[in-house]
């Protein structure tokens, strides 16, 4: 009977776990719907402001704005990595971290050796990972996703711009997971500073941009700027940077909720399978115990008859 109790305890424990994972799946699904609404609204605006900035950049001299080229004295680099504050979301965090580490190994190995590589980690998981490995961390953006707002994007950009203007780093790259659907997230390495020559497009932006990149006649728009391109550029560039980071934060948040929903759904399904297997094992063990008891009773009855 002790074996039966052990099996019963395991079934009860897994049943409790299943209830938790099912609840977490439902919470993630609700958060995902809200995150999707935000990212679907942000993408067109971020694309258009990028298009306009790129158009202005081509119209003007490369020296028209300090963010169009790296400071001459700058030798360092800043990598902004966006992860989650929590786990239980499959490979979401490890995908972003591995992408950042691959970027460092392939592009910034010498920079890291010279101790000129800096990391700005948005999310507890990435911050903890790179802090343990003694990277030079900039800022503190742990726990921002519970109340994610535009101020976070502005502060990240201000930290990145400050080091860029001071010549501490001459490149800023943004690493994050882009939301495609609940199953698929694209790992993105996006150049932020200096503003790239060609407009950067993620796989999802490439797909969605076909609907609004050009007018119906297929020709690029020739803008007329008022009060003038240089004046407009001073206003537009900060907004461009803010919205690229804001979009990346929203993409990552939506991808996180989608990954967590799928992970918790898989965990719930696995728990149900385990419960079925253990229930079958429990019934077999119980049947064996009953059979043994019946055999003991039968043997005892036969022994009494023989002795009588």
From Swiss-Prot:
KW Membrane (keyword) present = yes
Q: For this UniProt entry, which residues form the secretion signal?
A: none
Keywords of the record:
ATP synthesis, Cell inner membrane, Cell membrane, CF(1), Hydrogen ion transport, Ion transport, Membrane, Transport
BP GO terms, sorted: proton motive force-driven plasma membrane ATP synthesis
> What role does this protein play?
Produces ATP from ADP in the presence of a proton gradient across the membrane. The gamma chain is believed to be important in regulating ATPase activity and the flow of protons through the CF(0) complex.
Subunit and partners: F-type ATPases have 2 components, CF(1) - the catalytic core - and CF(0) - the membrane proton channel. CF(1) has five subunits: alpha(3), beta(3), gamma(1), delta(1), epsilon(1). CF(0) has three main subunits: a, b and c.
- Family stated for the protein in its record: Belongs to the ATPase gamma chain family.
Q: What is this protein called?
A: ATP synthase gamma chain
Organism equals Salinibacter ruber (strain DSM 13855 / M31)
């Amino acid at each position: 009977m002790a074996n039966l109790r052990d099996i019963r305890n395991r079934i009860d424990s897994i049943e409790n776990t299943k209830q938790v994972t099912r609840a977490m799946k439902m919470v993630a699904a609700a958060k995902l719907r809200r995150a999707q609404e935000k990212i679907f609204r942000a993408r067109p605006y971020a694309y258009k402001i990028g298009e306009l900035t790129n158009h202005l950049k081509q119209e003007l001299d490369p020296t028209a704005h300090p963010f169009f080229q790296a400071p001459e004295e700058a030798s360092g680099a800043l990598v902004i990595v966006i992860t989650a504050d929590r786990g239980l979301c499959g490979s979401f965090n490890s995908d972003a971290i591995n992408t950042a580490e691959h970027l460092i190994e392939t592009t910034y190995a010498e920079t890291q050796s010279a101790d000129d590589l800096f990391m700005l980690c948005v999310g507890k998981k990435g911050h903890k990972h790179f802090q343990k490995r003694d990277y030079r961390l900039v800022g503190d953006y742990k726990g921002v996703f519970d109340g994610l707002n535009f101020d976070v994007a502005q502060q990240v950009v201000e930290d990145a711009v400050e080091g860029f203007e001071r010549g501490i780093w001459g490149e800023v790259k943004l690493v994050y997971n882009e939301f495609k659907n609940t199953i698929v997230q694209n790992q993105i390495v996006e150049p932020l500073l200096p503003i790239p020559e060609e407009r950067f497009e993620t796989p999802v932006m490439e797909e969605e941009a076909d609907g609004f990149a050009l007018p119906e006649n297929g020709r690029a728009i020739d803008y007329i700027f008022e009060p003038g391109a240089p004046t407009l550029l001073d206003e537009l560039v900060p907004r461009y940077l803010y919205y690229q980071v804001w979009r990346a934060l929203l993409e990552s948040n939506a991808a996180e909720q989608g990954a967590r929903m799928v992970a918790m759904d898989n965990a719930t399904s696995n728990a149900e399978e385990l419960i079925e297997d253990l229930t079958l094992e429990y019934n077999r063990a119980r049947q064996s115990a009953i059979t043994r008891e019946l055999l003991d009773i039968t043997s005892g009855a036969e022994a009494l008859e023989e002795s009588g």
